[in-house]
UniProtKB/Swiss-Prot annotation:
MF annotations from Gene Ontology: alpha-galactosidase activity
Alphabetically ordered keywords of this record: Disulfide bond, Glycosidase, Hydrolase
Entry EC number(s): 3.2.1.22
Lineage: superkingdom: Eukaryota
Family: Belongs to the glycosyl hydrolase 27 family.
Protein name per the record: Alpha-galactosidase
Hydrolase recorded as keyword: yes
Keyword DNA-binding: no
Catalytic reaction annotation: Hydrolysis of terminal, non-reducing alpha-D-galactose residues in alpha-D-galactosides, including galactose oligosaccharides, galactomannans and galactolipids
Length: 14
C-alpha cells in the first residue's frame, strides 16, 4: 500500500 519503487520506476498502488 502506498508508493513503492519497482525496477527503478515509481508505482502507486492502493
Amino acid at each position: 500500500l502506498g508508493i513503492y519503487s519497482d525496477a527503478g520506476t515509481q508505482t502507486c498502488s492502493k
